[in-house]
């Protein structure tokens, strides 16, 4: 019989228990003459990423090879491309509630990450993980991501009066780009974009939402406002093509420092999976590439290790050096 106690398929809303899974396996083997087919299996993993990870963690040759399993197939966003953080929160809640029902401790594995946030533990998802990890006998393990060698992060320290530039290569056939700039609220930093044709667009860093237009591209900016739990401000920049694609070439993100008290800033692109193969920073920073929610305070962040070279994998997401 299966060691899977439950499957929750968020894409359909269906939930399966051990009895129904065992029954499916029995009927399927009877009809196929012993050859098992996964085509219509409950909560079938079409991507196979979750299956591969669970095999390492709890497969017959895995680490916890006798452990029971509660599996969640995550739902997707409206455009059906990437999971939503709310889906992940629902999945964690489901697993822990089931563990409470079975009166068993539980290790929750999350092999998911994104770049949206200040990477300081203060997003809703990170706070949720911190809180729910204290609610029961559980440990939450989160992969640190695969972004360290993908050139999706640029950051540093800027002092009063300095100008620093991030060079962003935009490949052909790039449909849209989201750029996040995070800085301390009390630092005054002006931002200017320069497109590959040399046109300069000064970004207004006051107000809320602003719109600009440059060659074949509409630019929408959203400025974050103070909150009780976050000392960082987001300057969100969305590049949207007027036709099919953004103007390819080197875009410059120019930071011009006014009054500076801290000076630390970070710029993130979306996950490399959401970008074209040639879209990346020319002068990236590998530190700070750990993905959210591995940045939560009460989780175990897990990197990737290369056993052949006895070192961490080049792609393994990294935290900050401070």
Q: What are these model-derived regions, one by one?
A:
Residues 80-81, 119-122, 151-156, 265-267:
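Short acidic, glycine/serine/threonine-rich loops at helix termini
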Residues 58-59, 93-100, 130, 134:
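Sec-exported extracytoplasmic/periplasmic mature domains
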Residues 1-86, 103, 107, 135-137, ...:
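Subtilisin-like serine protease catalytic core
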Residues 8-31, 135, 150-245, 249, ...:
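Extracellular S/T/G-rich loop segment that most often corresponds to the catalytic His/Ser-adjacent loop
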């Amino acid at each position: 019989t299966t060691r899977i106690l439950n499957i929750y398929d968020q894409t359909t809303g269906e939930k399966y228990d051990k009895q129904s899974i065992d029954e499916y396996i029995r009927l399927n083997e009877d009809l196929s003459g012993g050859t098992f087919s996964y085509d219509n299996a409950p909560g079938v993993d079409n991507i196979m990423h979750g299956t591969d990870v669970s095999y390492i963690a709890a497969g017959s040759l895995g680490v916890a090879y006798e452990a029971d399993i509660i599996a969640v197939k995550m739902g997707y966003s409206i455009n059906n491309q990437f999971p939503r953080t709310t889906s992940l929160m629902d999945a964690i809640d489901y697993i822990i509630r089931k563990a409470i029902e079975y009166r068993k401790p539980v290790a929750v594995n999350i092999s998911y990450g994104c770049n949206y946030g200040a990477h300081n533990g203060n997003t809703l998802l990170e706070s949720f993980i911190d809180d729910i990890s204290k609610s029961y006998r559980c440990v939450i393990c989160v992969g640190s991501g695969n972004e360290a060698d993908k050139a999706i992060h640029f950051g540093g320290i800027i002092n009063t009066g300095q100008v620093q530039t991030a060079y962003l290569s935009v490949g052909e056939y790039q449909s849209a780009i989201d750029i996040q700039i995070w800085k301390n609220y009390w630092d005054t930093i002006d931002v200017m974009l320069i497109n590959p044709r040399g046109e300069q667009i000064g970004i207004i860093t006051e107000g809320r939402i602003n719109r600009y237009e440059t060659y074949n591209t509409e630019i929408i900016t959203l400025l974050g406002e103070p909150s009780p739990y976050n000392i960082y401000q987001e300057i969100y920049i969305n590049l949207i093509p007027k036709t099919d694609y953004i103007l390819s070439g080197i875009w410059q993100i120019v930071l011009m420092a006014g009054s500076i008290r801290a000076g630390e800033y970070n710029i993130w692109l979306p996950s490399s999976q959401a970008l074209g193969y040639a879209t990346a920073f020319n002068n990236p920073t590998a530190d700070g590439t750990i993905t959210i929610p591995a940045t939560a305070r009460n989780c175990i962040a897990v990197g990737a290790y290369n056993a052949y070279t006895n070192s961490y994998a080049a792609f393994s997401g990294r935290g900050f050096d401070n």
